[in-house]
């Protein structure tokens, strides 16, 4: 039996854990298609331009493990109408209860589509995303970091690194981030950062470090026994290279390059948004 086709619609600008929890809950009802609002629709709805352009929002959402596909809507389209998408016939439109739309509900009724609202309580908590099925014979790759403002640059890094093997991301625990970066860090607590990272379809599993210092992931590395430790050029410090050499782990340094056509992002800059 084919899975149920579910549609959700919105701007999904500056995606946070709450947005991903909504997508996760929607995905439990069937395959999720995101009808993504264009920049003009966000400007009209909020009075301000989106923080991230349509192409970047589309790239980010396409990497979310709870999303089957993303369809950008045309400028001028009715954002509350059931979109006409070739070969796609949804049986369910899902909204958060706080975003209930009588216009959407009426449109769904006209087309025989169920309209369902998810209560806010259903998005409570930050459950650890379950590990993806391991591919036999693939190497284990680990990356580490703070991931305090998860953005398209992180997604691109994960996309590239996951080509080397099954990717495990070890997120720095709160106390260690404060130790390394000072007061005011991290912006987001460790459970939320792990949830954001673990929602990527490129990530086999996201974990929280339990060690200290620049190689705070040592206990997790000892348990996982990865063959590759990957960093970007900014992360090539703190004795990681020597740590890997002493343990026979291949050490790879990747350049910080955004996905084609997208701007370069950094968490430090985004904290000023």
Predicted regions span which residues?
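Nucleotidyltransferase catalytic core that binds NTPs
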Residues: 1-273
